[in-house]
Amino acid sequence: MARHPRWTLSQVTELFEKPLLELLFEAQQIHRQHFDPQQVQVSTLLSIKTGACPEDCKYCPQSSRYKTGLEAERLMEVEQVLDSARKAKNAGSTRFCMGAAWKNPHERDMPYLEKIVQGVKAMGLETCMTLGMLNESQAQRLANAGLDYYNHNLDTSPEFYGNIITTRTYQERLDTLEKVREAGIKVCSGGIVGLGETVTDRAGLLLQLANLPTPPESVPINMLVKVKGTPLADNDDVDAFDFIRTIAVARIMMPTSYVRLSAGREQMNEQTQAMCFMAGANSIFYGCKLLTTPNPAEDKDLQLFRKLGLNPQQTRVLAGDNEQQQRLEQTLMTPDTDDYYNAAAL
């Protein structure tokens, strides 16, 4: 947390209590000061290791503690990962994210991780990873290999956290974010709405994120996807307006961060997603899966973009900017592959 917090809990609570339309108006004004309101960042991820996670996160079907029917998959071979990255670049992607269902990587995994980061970077792509907790040495090694972004979510408020996870502490999550930042890697961190938390807990989560010494460059806001076999399978549905309100407050509190619609978009109608964009969301994941749950197909996303007058964000890479952007737009228009799917709730 910053020495002199930018926000207090009472200030954040006041935002959550504002009339919704007034809140949306404020969020949209702030959004337009820092971003093109017609541009949405589109990200794609690959799971390099799925399932058999030793953690007990109550929302997660990848935990080995719950019987969800998910089949564990071994760590992908380096060439498999690089081949997927090549295909992603040919399809127009400029950032390639890799996720592994681990509590933390082991030292024996580091040469493998460094090799795939270096290989993907050599293609002119930005790199992102979500691997669980990192120590200082691991963060620095990934940074030296060329890793651009690292995802590690806080999930919820410190007060509610123990109801959801017991196998790692909240402070351990904060420590990982600090190590990532100190290594020079950009931070991606957010949370989940629908865990059974209160509005005060949602305020507490955003308070933690916004008061970090440097707020995350990317803030994914997930809506709980209830998976049979997990302890939260019977949780109440999230009210759409409550979710939209959370997006708006995140935008106001972290005006220069990308606020990303992550897990749960498959269960949102177009109207809800449109209001999320109005509230300041400006990033999505696309592909057939997000983590191990459904995500809207690329063609549905493009149709929604057309209806709302939105466009995939122009992103600079080492070479071929215009050509890659054209390929991305063409891929969104004519998706014909399931090779790319979102593997982690970022």
UniProtKB/Swiss-Prot annotation:
SMART domains: BATS, Elp3
Residue ranges occupied by any Radical SAM core domain in the UniProt entry: 38-256
PROSITE patterns: RADICAL_SAM
Catalyzed reactions per annotation: (4R,5S)-dethiobiotin + (sulfur carrier)-SH + 2 reduced [2Fe-2S]-[ferredoxin] + 2 S-adenosyl-L-methionine = (sulfur carrier)-H + biotin + 2 5'-deoxyadenosine + 2 L-methionine + 2 oxidized [2Fe-2S]-[ferredoxin]
UniProt cross-references to Pfam families, sorted A to Z: BATS, Radical_SAM
SUPFAM superfamilies assigned: Radical SAM enzymes (SSF102114)
Pathway linked to the protein: Cofactor biosynthesis; biotin biosynthesis; biotin from 7,8-diaminononanoate: step 2/2
Example of a GO biological process term: biotin biosynthetic process
Single annotated GO MF: 2 iron, 2 sulfur cluster binding
Top-level lineage group: Bacteria
Entry binding sites for [2Fe-2S] cluster: C97, C128, C188, R260
Enzyme Commission number: 2.8.1.6
Keywords noted in UniProt: 2Fe-2S, 4Fe-4S, Biotin biosynthesis, Iron, Iron-sulfur, Metal-binding, S-adenosyl-L-methionine, Transferase
Binding site for [4Fe-4S] cluster: C53, C57, C60
Enzyme class of the recorded protein, top EC level: transferase
Names of required cofactors: [4Fe-4S] cluster; [2Fe-2S] cluster
InterPro entries: Aldolase_TIM, BATS_dom, Biotin_synth/BioAB, Biotin_synthase, Elp3/MiaA/NifB-like_rSAM, rSAM
Cofactor binding note: Binds 1 [4Fe-4S] cluster. The cluster is coordinated with 3 cysteines and an exchangeable S-adenosyl-L-methionine. Binds 1 [2Fe-2S] cluster. The cluster is coordinated with 3 cysteines and 1 arginine.
Family, per entry: Belongs to the radical SAM superfamily. Biotin synthase family.
Known partners and oligomeric status: Homodimer.
Matching PANTHER family: BIOTIN SYNTHASE, BIOTIN SYNTHASE, MITOCHONDRIAL
Function comment: Catalyzes the conversion of dethiobiotin (DTB) to biotin by the insertion of a sulfur atom into dethiobiotin via a radical-based mechanism.
Protein name (database record): Biotin synthase
UniProt organism field: Salmonella agona (strain SL483)
